[in-house]
Every structure is written in structure tokens, then in C-alpha cells.
Amino acid sequence: MIRVGVLGAKGRVGTTIVAEVEQNPNLELSAALDHGDDLQELVDAKTDVVVDFTQPDSVMSNVEFCIRNGIHAVIGTTGWTEERYETVRSLLQDSPKVGVLVAPNFAISAVLTMKFAEIAAPFFESAEVIEFHHPNKLDAPSGTAVHTAEGIARARREAGLEEQPDATAQSLDGARGSDVQGVPVHAVRMTGMVAHEEVIFGTRGQSLTIRQDSYDRESFVPGVVIGVEKIADNPGLTIGLEKFLGLD
């Protein structure tokens, strides 16, 4: 039985995760904490793994607390940068048995979309990413879209492809999206949407569209459970769920 603490327990995703932990026979809810609650409750409750769906401005202090107290962490909170990853790696040097998983998306369909995009990238001259989310999302573009674009860019470099063709000389600010290592990324914020992504590839006489849709926050649950069940066997920092799904 894995004792699980949920941070952001009253949030949209957090409430879904709490409900899953409470009904999953292999998991036990040790603590359900939200803004203002004392993290020491995690230690007092002998928590094995923390699931964090909080806010970008609080996630780093949460992760540091977990690492210093020997608690594994499964992180779905967004707003990660390379500097933040380096901070976590540094903290983990003093706690080599602790595992931290940071995943830009826990929906297995989204993880597969990123993998499929990486496979397709070397075969097309052009690639662009469009992500769609609800209007309450704080960051743009999403971590999933950035991660997708980075994978495409890496695959293009390894294949020796040239820069994408684009003769645009004049444009309104933002019309061509954000440039992520040479891959344009566009963000849509729209009422009624949850989390969706399209990756569009094009080359001579043909195009390929890969699309993923999360219609409900239940879509994140299977991936989170996999992370919780496997994190103890994967010490150190893991970025993305791919390794835990055998896709790396």
C-alpha cells in the first residue's frame, strides 16, 4: 500500500486525484492539503509519495520540502524552466534515494502524441504546434506544447534538416506564434475547452495532423497512478512520463 499525499487537493485536478486515491485498492490517502495548510502533515502522516497539482509560484518550495524529508514527488504543476530542473537536481544530490517526476502532461494520449510527433518530424519540411486550453490556464504556451516542440526540434536536428521554410516578412505581433527552437507554437484560450493539442506537419503534396483531446480531468488519472506506483523505483529527476510507459 502506497501512502499518497495530494497538494492542491481542492483544485480541479486535485479533487479528481483525491477521489482516485480513496477508491484505488493499492493506494491510501495520507493527506489532502491545499493553500495555507502545513506541509509537516505529510511527514506526520508518513507519506510515501506526494502528488502536486498546485501553482507555479509554490511548487518549488513544495518539492524542496519533499526532497529534504525523503518523500517522492509526482508533479503535474506547470511553469518549469531549465533553471528549476537544475535546482531540483542539486537538491537531489543530498537525497539520492528520492524520486521526482515532473510531467508536462499525464494524459497517456498526450504522451503518445509527443512521441508520435518526434517520430514523424524527420520526414516533413514544416511542423507547427497548436494547443487549446480553458481560459483559466495561467501559462502560455502550455508545458505540453513546449515539450512537443522541443522533441520535434531535436528530431529535426538529429536528421540534419534545414530550418523550416517561412518567407513571412511582415506580421502582427504573435501572428506566427512563439518560436520554440525553430518550431512555431500557438496557444488558444477558449471557454468550453479542457486540454487539446494539434501537431501539423507538411511536406511536398501532403500533410499530417496528430491531435489529442482531453475532455475531462479524469484523463490525467491513469498517468498519475503510473507515476505514483513507479516513482520509488526511479530515484533522481525524471522529466516526462515516457520512461514510465516504456517509450524511452
UniProtKB/Swiss-Prot annotation:
Q: Name one GO biological process term.
A: diaminopimelate biosynthetic process
Q: Which keywords does this Swiss-Prot/TrEMBL entry list?
A: Amino-acid biosynthesis, Cytoplasm, Diaminopimelate biosynthesis, Lysine biosynthesis, NAD, NADP, Oxidoreductase
**Reaction catalysed by this chain?**
(S)-2,3,4,5-tetrahydrodipicolinate + NAD(+) + H2O = (2S,4S)-4-hydroxy-2,3,4,5-tetrahydrodipicolinate + NADH + H(+); (S)-2,3,4,5-tetrahydrodipicolinate + NADP(+) + H2O = (2S,4S)-4-hydroxy-2,3,4,5-tetrahydrodipicolinate + NADPH + H(+)
Asked if Signal is a keyword of the record, the answer is: no
- Provide the protein's localization: Cytoplasm
SUPFAM superfamilies membership: Glyceraldehyde-3-phosphate dehydrogenase-like, C-terminal domain, NAD(P)-binding Rossmann-fold domains
Q: Which PROSITE patterns match?
A: DAPB
> In the UniProt entry, which residues are flagged as the active site?
H133 (proton donor/acceptor), K137 (proton donor)
InterPro entries documented for this protein: DapB_C (IPR022663), DapB_N (IPR000846), DapB_N_CS (IPR022664), DHDPR_bac (IPR023940), NAD(P)-bd_dom_sf (IPR036291)
Question: Can you name one GO molecular function term for this protein?
Answer: NADP binding
Extract one GO cellular component term from the record.
cytosol
The record lists NAD(+) as bound by: G8, A9, K10, G11, R12, V13, D34, G76, T77, T78, A103, P104, N105, F106
Residues that bind (S)-2,3,4,5-tetrahydrodipicolinate, according to the entry?
Answer: H134, G143, T144
Look up the record and name the pathway of this protein. Amino-acid biosynthesis; L-lysine biosynthesis via DAP pathway; (S)-tetrahydrodipicolinate from L-aspartate: step 4/4
Q: What is the E.C. number?
A: 1.17.1.8
Q: Name one Pfam family in it.
A: DapB_N
Record family assignment: Belongs to the DapB family.
Known role: Catalyzes the conversion of 4-hydroxy-tetrahydrodipicolinate (HTPA) to tetrahydrodipicolinate.
- The name of this protein is 4-hydroxy-tetrahydrodipicolinate reductase
Q: Which species is this UniProt entry from? A: Corynebacterium urealyticum (strain ATCC 43042 / DSM 7109)
Phylogenetic placement of the source organism: Bacteria, Bacillati, Actinomycetota, Actinomycetes, Mycobacteriales
